[in-house]
């Protein structure tokens, strides 16, 4: 559990401190993001017997592949950002200082694994997600559902 929290703190810190253009984060954020994904993969492996973890691990793995293949940043489709109504985020990504994400270009590898699926209003939190994100969402749902059913049976 502690490693999941550490990975979340690293990723949140990258977004928060990167947005403030902290040089250390801008220079080493890629490595920190990759490290956070390695932590999540380790936790998934360690807990592989729990229902839903394999889907979570697959989602993390797919996101990890596209991030590593694209210089340590998750590519995002510009058209999907507009469809989701995330116009301000487009401007942020065009600046090129956002540590964890970048816009898809002609050089982007594994585009089909990138953040290309818009979740627009009326979705409560408009965003753009990847296939890996959906697998993780479903895996977490399955994990929670299984835990609730086990508790109910005891």
Model-predicted segments: where are they?
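Membrane-interface loop-to-helix entry segments
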Residues: 28-35, 126-138
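Interfacial segments of alpha-helical transmembrane regions
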Residues: 39-68
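Hydrophobic alpha-helical transmembrane segments
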Residues: 14-20, 41-47, 141
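Membrane-interface capping segments at transmembrane-helix boundaries
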Residues: 146-154
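Transmembrane alpha-helix/helix-exit interface in multi-pass inner-membrane proteins
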Residues: 62-86
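Transmembrane alpha-helical insertion/packing segments
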Residues: 1-37
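Extracytosolic (periplasmic/ER-lumenal) interhelical loops and adjacent juxtamembrane/interface segments
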Residues: 78-128
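Hydrophobic transmembrane-helix microenvironments that flank and shape a buried ionizable site
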Residues: 8, 60, 112, 127-130, ...
């Amino acid at each position: 559990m502690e490693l999941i929290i550490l990975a979340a703190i690293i990723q949140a810190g990258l977004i928060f401190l990167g947005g403030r253009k902290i040089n250390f984060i801008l220079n080493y954020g890629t490595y920190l993001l990759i490290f956070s994904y390695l932590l999540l993969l380790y936790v998934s492996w360690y807990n592989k017997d729990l229902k839903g973890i394999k889907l979570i691990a697959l989602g993390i793995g797919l996101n990890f592949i596209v991030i590593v293949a694209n210089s340590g940043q998750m590519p995002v489709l510009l058209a999907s950002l507009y469809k989701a109504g995330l116009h301000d985020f487009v401007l942020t990504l065009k600046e090129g200082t956002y540590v964890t994400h970048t816009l898809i270009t002609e050089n982007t590898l594994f585009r089909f694994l990138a953040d290309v699926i818009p979740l627009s209003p009326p979705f409560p939190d408009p965003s753009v997600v990847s296939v890996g994100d959906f697998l993780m969402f479903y895996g977490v749902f399955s994990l929670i559902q299984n835990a609730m059913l086990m508790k109910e049976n005891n």
